[in-house]
UniProtKB/Swiss-Prot annotation:
It is found in: Preautophagosomal structure. This is Autophagy-related protein 29. Keywords: Autophagy, Protein transport, Transport. The lineage of its organism: Eukaryota, Fungi, Dikarya, Ascomycota, Saccharomycotina. Transmembrane segments: none annotated. Plays a role in autophagy. Functions at the preautophagosomal structure (PAS) in order to form normal autophagosomes under starvation conditions. Also plays a role in mitophagy and regulation of filamentous growth. Belongs to the ATG29 family. GO terms for cellular component: Atg1/ULK1 kinase complex; phagophore assembly site. InterPro entries: ATG29, Atg29_N, ATG29_sf. It comes from Vanderwaltozyma polyspora (strain ATCC 22028 / DSM 70294 / BCRC 21397 / CBS 2163 / NBRC 10782 / NRRL Y-8283 / UCD 57-17). The keyword NAD does not apply.
Length: 208
């Protein structure tokens, strides 16, 4: 018992209200408080009701005091629970953790990773060693596109890709030659027919 949870009644002079009864003296100790808390803290749902009259008779404490004391116990425990939650959230918040320490407060040796610009160059990291060792490998440089295009053209010419004849041109040439041969044959055929006809006509005219 202390000043924060002890009710003090002061008797003053004057007429008592009608039906007023002096509260009976009672004893309140830690054992009774634990017993009260064990009962009110184990309620399963709002449907369960406390029989304050029976509880008052069992603990031998006035009913009004049990209700007030129950409210005080719940209030104190809720405050403790709120502080516990606040402390737990603070310890688990990464923004509130001291740099160089873990969330549990243990210090760890953190080494800074020094990454230079050259070590993270994607060109150096992505090049294949087989391509670099290839004599026909051409390194593409964005800053010198003309030189790169010229080198690429030279590589294509040396690899005989551009020197090969176009298959479409070859087919067109073959078709043209076939058409020319066919035209010549038809012409000679028609000439031979005309010559034969002229010979027959001359023979008839000459009555041979």
């Amino acid at each position: 018992m202390d000043n924060s949870n002890t009710a003090i009644y002061i008797r003053v002079k004057g007429q008592r209200p009608k039906g007023f009864v002096d509260p009976l003296p009672f004893e309140w100790n830690l054992e009774k408080e634990k017993r009260l808390w064990s009962i009110i803290s184990t309620l399963d749902s709002n449907r369960q009701q406390i029989n304050w009259k029976l509880l008052s008779e069992t603990i031998e404490v006035p009913e009004y005091f049990l209700k007030e004391r129950s409210y005080t116990l719940f209030s104190n425990n809720l405050q403790k629970l709120g502080k516990f939650i606040d402390n737990n959230n603070t310890s688990n918040d990464p923004s509130k953790v001291i740099p160089g320490t873990s969330q549990t407060g243990d210090y760890s040796n953190l080494k800074a990773l020094d990454v230079s610009k050259g070590s993270m160059d994607g060109k150096d990291m992505c090049q294949d060693m087989k391509e670099i060792n290839d004599p026909n490998y051409v390194d593409y440089d964005v800053d010198n596109e003309d030189e790169t295009a010229e080198l690429t053209l030279q590589k294509l010419q040396t690899s005989k890709i551009l020197t090969q004849q176009n298959p479409m041109k070859i087919r067109s040439k073959e078709r043209k030659e076939e058409f020319q041969e066919t035209s010549d044959a038809d012409l000679w055929s028609s000439l031979s027919v005309s010559t034969s006809a002229l010979e027959e006509a001359l023979m008839d005219r000459m009555h041979i």
